[in-house]
Structures are given as C-alpha cells and as structure tokens.
Amino acid sequence: VKSYVTSKQLKVKLKFEPDDFMIEADAAKLKQILYNLLSNAVKFTGTGGQIEIYVYKREDVAEFIVRDNGIGIAEQDQKKVFVEFEQVDSSYTREYEGTGLGLPLVKKMVEMHGGYVYLKSALGEGTEVIFLIPLQQGMKKQ
C-alpha cells in the first residue's frame, strides 16, 4: 500500500485519541481490516488526495474511521459493498479492479469481534468507513 500512496502523492493523516488504550482483539484480523480499508481508500482516491485514519476510545468501544476524498459511492449502491462478490458497477468504478470481497470480509471480521461497520459516502465527495469494536469482548466463533 505504501508504494501506491507514494506514487499517487496521497496525504495520509493518522490520529489516535487517547494514544494509550488497549483493545482485546485478534491483532492479525484487526490489521487485515485496516489494510483492506486503507487499500480501498488508496484505490479510489485520485492523485494528490487525502486519506485520514482515526482511532478513538468511546466508553467501552474503540471507534475506527477511515476517510478519503476519493470518488465516493452513490447512496443506492452503499448496501451492495458489504455483500460478497457485489461491486458497484458505474462509470465511476468500472476502471478499478477487485473481487468484491474486501468490505464483506471487513464486515465479517468486525462482527467476529462483536462490533459493527457502516459507511457514509456521496459520489464525488469520498467515503468514510466507520467500525466499532468492544474494548474487552471475546471474539465470536464462526
């Protein structure tokens, strides 16, 4: 991902607040969730764009936000992106390759941690994916 960020001259902003709290989570799965979301943000953000990653402690949950100022997703297509093998098929996204598994996988891994994921987006205005994971809840077996 780093090479794509560099080649597209993207600005990446990171913020952790506070910067010293712990989350009981599967580290590999949490890393995969963030990798998938960051990869999508990079893929759908144009040269010179911006990506922001925020992590907040909210009472008993950790809130993660991955925001970009890329192409965005039309309202009628937003539910599709969390369904396996579904992809938004429009002139905006046709040039981008993918399997349609990234966000469904994110959803499944977040839910395994007892959390949930949703997004806010509009065409031409970028996308914000938010997921919340309980700070001290065991993973659900699948």
Segments (PLM) and residue ranges:
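Conserved catalytic submotifs in the C-terminal HATPase_c
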Residues: 6, 11-21
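Short helix-loop "hinge" at the ATP-lid/N-box region of the Bergerat-fold HATPase_c
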Residues: 41-42
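Short beta-strand/loop element within the Bergerat-fold HATPase_c
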Residues: 48-60
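Short alpha-helical Gxxx[C/S/T] motif in the catalytic ATP-binding
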Residues: 97, 102, 106
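Conserved glycine-rich
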Residues: 114-115
